Design a protein with these regions (language model features):
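C-terminal catalytic domain of Rieske-type non-heme iron oxygenases
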Residues: 17, 76-285
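Rieske [2Fe-2S] iron-sulfur-binding domain
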Residues: 2-92
Length: 285
C-alpha cells in the first residue's frame, strides 16, 4: 500500500484496494494501522490528524521490505521472502510509487519482457542492433514462476554502471501481482541486485506500482538510485497505459507469442491455473 517511511504519524492516508476505499496511518509508536474507510473517525479528511483510538476494526497488515501490506480477506499464508534483504551491506529503499492506468497482471508481464529493452529503454537497458533474446529457462511451481539464464546486452545496466555489459537476469513471480528481478552487479559479478515491482491493484485497470530496490552499491546516493529507477519505469508507464485491453488476456490464442514472451506465457498459464479473475480477461471455456 505504501512505503512505511512515507506514512505520516497520526496523519490520515487513503487509497484504493480492489476497488474499496482503505485508510491507514501510524500511531505515536510508529506502528502502522489499516482499516476500511467506512470506519474513519467522524469528519476526518485525508491528510488530517486522526485519533487512531476511534478507528473501528483494523484490517490484517504486515510491514515487510519497508512497505505496508494489507488484505481484505484472511489469508492462510505469509508474504513471500526476499533473503537478500537480510544482507547488511545492501541499500534497501523504495524507488518510487506511481499510479498507472493498467491492470496489475499487465504490469507484471511487461516487467518480464526483455524484448522491449532496445526500443523502450534505448541507450540504457538495450540498444539496436543488439536485440536478440537468447534462449532461457522457465520453471513453474504452485508458489512461483522462475526464469533463469536470461542474458541481455545493456549500455547502462544500473545507476553505478561505467559502461556496457551483458547482464545476467533471473526473474521471479512469487505472487500474481508482484515480480522480482535479480541482475548481476557491475562491480561484483558474484552478487545480484534485486529490483521488484509490488503492484497494488486499486481497481481492475488501475494500479499503484511500488518500485522496490535492494542494491549492492556503495557509490550512488539514494536519490541517484531512485532517479534511475523512476527514469526506467517512467518509460514503461507510457507503454503500459497504451496497452489494449488493459486487463491481461489469459487465452493463449489472444496474442501471438515469440521467444521473448516465454516467461509471459508461463505466467499467464500460472494465473489461469490459480483461477485468478481480477485484472485479467479469462480464457474461453
Amino acid at each position: 500500500m505504501s512505503a512505511v517511511s512515507e506514512i505520516g504519524v497520526g496523519r490520515l492516508h487513503r487509497t484504493l484496494l480492489l476497488g474499496e476505499l482503505i485508510s491507514y496511518s501510524r500511531d505515536s509508536n510508529g506502528d502502522a494501522v489499516v482499516w476500511r474507510s467506512t470506519s474513519d473517525p467522524t469528519n476526518s479528511a485525508k491528510g488530517a490528524t486522526v485519533d487512531l483510538s476511534e478507528v473501528g476494526s483494523p484490517l490484517p497488515m504486515r510491514v515487510k521490505f519497508g512497505y505496508l501490506w494489507t488484505t481484505l480477506g484472511n489469508p492462510d499464508h505469509e508474504i513471500f521472502d526476499i533473503p537478500e534483504c537480510d544482507e547488511t551491506d545492501r541499500r534497501v529503499l523504495n524507488g518510487g510509487s506511481l499510479m498507472v492506468n493498467v491492470s496489475a497482471p499487465r504490469a507484471v508481464e511487461n516487467f518480464l519482457d526483455m524484448g522491449h529493452f532496445p526500443y523502450v529503454h534505448t541507450g540504457l537497458l538495450g540498444i539496436e542492433p543488439r536485440t536478440e533474446v537468447v534462449e532461457y529457462n522457465v520453471e513453474t511451481t504452485d508458489a512461483q514462476v522462475l526464469a533463469t539464464g536470461c542474458k541481455f546486452y545493456q549500455p547502462v545496466a544500473a545507476a553505478s554502471a561505467a559502461g556496457g555489459q551483458v547482464t545476467e537476469y533471473t526473474y521471479r513471480v512469487p505472487h500474481p501481482y508482484c515480480v522480482l528481478l535479480y541482475k548481476s552487479v557491475h562491480a561484483d559479478p558474484s552478487r545480484m541486485d534485486v529490483i521488484a515491482l509490488f503492484n497494488q491493484p486499486m481497481t481492475e485497470e488501475r494500479i499503484r506500482a511500488h518500485n522496490f530496490l535492494s542494491m549492492v552499491d556503495d557509490v550512488s546516493s539514494d536519490n541517484t538510485l531512485k532517479h534511475f529507477q523512476q527514469l526506467i519505469f517512467g518509460q514503461d508507464k507510457t507503454i503500459l497505459e497504451n496497452q489494449f485491453p488493459k486487463r491481461l488476456p489469459l487465452d493463449p490464442r489472444a496474442e501471438t507469442p515469440i521467444r521473448a514472451d516465454k516467461s509471459a506465457i508461463h505466467y499467464r498459464r500460472w494465473l489461469s491455473n490459480k483461477g485468478l479473475t481480477y485484472g485479467v480477461v479469462a480464457a474461453a471455456s
